[in-house]
Amino acid sequence: MAAELMIEEAVAKGYPPAVLYLRNDDIVSTEVCAFNYFSVFLKEHPDAEAHVWLFDRTGKHVGYFRRDLGPNGQLQLDTSTLCSNVSGTVAMTLLPKQDTKVRSGRKVTTGYYAQYYSKHGAITLSHEREPVAAKSFPTSAWMQTYLSRFVESSGVVLINSCLAADGGSVGTARLMALNGDVLDERSLPSIAPMGAHRVPTLELFPDAKRLIGSSEGFSMEFKGTNIASPFSYYEFANGKFSLHHF
C-alpha cells in the first residue's frame, strides 16, 4: 500500500488541494465527487491519483483516502465511511501518475464537487473554490444576501484554508441592510488552520430580527485573515437545507 501523501507535499508539487466544507452527522453526510480530467488533457499520461484529506472543526487531521484513477476514471467517496461523525473541512487533489512538472510559481488546482445528503431527502452540492494556502492571507470582504422570512433558519459556514501552524483566522462579521447600512458588527471567534465554524444568523446577531425590521432581505459580510469563501445556508425544521458559496 502506498504511503500517505502529506498535504504539504501536494502543495510543494504545485497541486494544492482545494477545500470544501465537510459535514457528517446524524442529519447530513458528505460525498466527494471527481473525474480524472488528466486523461482528457494529458492523453499520453492518462492515469492519476486522487488524494483526500479530512479535518475536524478544530483543524485536526482525522482521515485520509487515496485511489488510483485510470482513463476517464471517477471518484464518488462517501466520507462518512471514513469519519462518521465529523464536521470540518475536506481537501482534495488529483496528481498525474507521470511526474508532470508545474512551472515555478504556477499551480494546478483540482475541480471537484461535494454532495451533501440529508437523511430527510434533501440533496445539495457545491463545487470547490480556493486551494489551501501555505501562508496566512488577507481576506477581502465576502458578502451574501439572505431572505428575511428565513432568518431563523439561516446561517453561515466559515472555513480557514490556511495550513500554517500560526495561521488562525481573525475577522469581523457585519449585519447589513440592503441599502448598505451597517446594522450590527461582531468580532468572529478564531478558527484554527483547516478548521471550520458553522453558526446560525441569530446566534451571531441575536438582535437581527429587530434590526432587519420589515425589509424583505438582509446581507452578512465577513472579512479578516485566513477566511476562505464562506457558505450561506438555510436549514429548516423538516430537515430540508441548502448550501451556497458566497
Can you say where each PLM-predicted feature lies in the sequence?
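Gly/Pro-rich, tryptophan- and cysteine-flecked surface segments typical
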Residues: M1-F246
